[in-house]
Amino acid sequence: MGNTFGHLFRVTTFGESHGGGVGVVVDGCPPRLELSEVDIQKELDRRRPGQSRLTTPRQESDRCEILSGVFEGKTLGTPIAILVRNKDTRPEDYAEMAQVYRPSHADATYDAKYGIRNWQGGGRSSARETIGRVAAGAIARKILTQVAGTEIIAYVKRVKDIEAVVDPDTVAAAAVEANIMRCPDAATAEKMIALVDEVRRQANSIGGVIECVVRNVPVGLGSPVFDKLEADLAKGVMSLPASKGFEIGSGFAGTLLTGQEHNDEFYTDAQGRIRTRTNRSGGVQGGISNGENIILRVAFKPTATIGQAQKTVNRAGEETILAAKGRHDPCVLPRAVPMVEAMVALVLCDHLLRDHAQCHLNF
């Protein structure tokens, strides 16, 4: 199973949705970084369930425990183990799903591949696995902030066909956190919330798009060919549950332009830095960051587990009907915002360490 992510900043998540707990081991964190559970908890609180009526009603405090790798408030350079214990588990809600497959969920493919699966809340396929990613992302984020002043802000850009108008170059984190939708366009956020409320009452679900901007990105992150920065960013965010699409910069809209229209022309600013007049490249050229803002978008499908009756089959292949029980998000987007930020932070931190290891030696 692919439970480890990264090269120098390596992250291994563990645990199941309704098991004893979930967590992460971070290997490769530089020593002497000031780190406490408070640094991690503030990000976990943004991800936790039960925040509002738009999220799953499961009630978890998601209190984190640092088990190793930190001494007297600073990292040791040794593996950092972080644990979050599960408290509000109801495995009995999923008893029917031990035999019946949820449409568009991981149930059938897990059974086909492994011949066994944890059917209680989806086990490793549950979004609860992302607790470890968000915890590790908090550490990566702190490294990026201290080394380069890097700022990562994600927000809900679109819910179904309702799209927000947001300037990624100026959007503030406070505006994102100002409403339960995590959409900085307040008027559009109200429309999104109303739509999610309607879908929730129908025991249905809905998807959309999250946009993410990264500011103060060091020049030179990423490598040509197989380790291009945008390729690793795509892998990171596309590994999140329910993700179905990725684009960076102009993305698919760039296919409608000519080269003359699409190219980002260069100039030298007052500080002598090479800049681009536009940013259709999304901050990455040739697989390497150019110092401009990185702007990417991630598409998330509607939550697969819904309360409406659907046609499916059981493990024996017999056709049946399933109206799923359990507690689930009618829309994953508000809680996926910190997940996207975490994966972007993990990718950038790993590439930052790799860049320093390869390109910053003096001979």
Curated annotation (Swiss-Prot):
Free-text comment on the cofactor: Reduced FMN (FMNH(2)).
A cellular component term, taken from the record's GO annotations: cytosol
GO BP annotations, alphabetical order: amino acid biosynthetic process; aromatic amino acid family biosynthetic process; chorismate biosynthetic process
Gene name linked to the record: aroC
Pfam family, one: Chorismate_synt
EC number: 4.2.3.5
InterPro entries assigned to the protein according to its UniProt record, in alphabetical order: Chorismate_synth, Chorismate_synth_AroC_sf, Chorismate_synthase_CS
Similarity comment text for this entry: Belongs to the chorismate synthase family.
Organism per entry: Thermosynechococcus vestitus (strain NIES-2133 / IAM M-273 / BP-1)
Entries under CDD domains matching the protein: Chorismate_synthase
Pathway(s) the chain acts in: Metabolic intermediate biosynthesis; chorismate biosynthesis; chorismate from D-erythrose 4-phosphate and phosphoenolpyruvate: step 7/7
Protein name: Chorismate synthase
Signal peptide: none
GO molecular function term, any single one: FMN binding
PANTHER family for the chain: CHORISMATE SYNTHASE (PTHR21085:SF0)
PROSITE patterns linked to this entry: CHORISMATE_SYNTHASE_1 (PS00787), CHORISMATE_SYNTHASE_2 (PS00788), CHORISMATE_SYNTHASE_3 (PS00789)
Binding-site residues for NADP(+), renumbered to this chain: 47, 53
Assembly and binders: Homotetramer.
Record: residues binding FMN: 124-126, 286, 301-305, 327
Reactions accelerated catalytically: 5-O-(1-carboxyvinyl)-3-phosphoshikimate = chorismate + phosphate
Function of the protein: This reaction introduces a second double bond into the aromatic ring system.
Cofactor: FMNH2
Lineage, top ranks: Bacteria, Bacillati, Cyanobacteriota, Cyanophyceae, Acaryochloridales
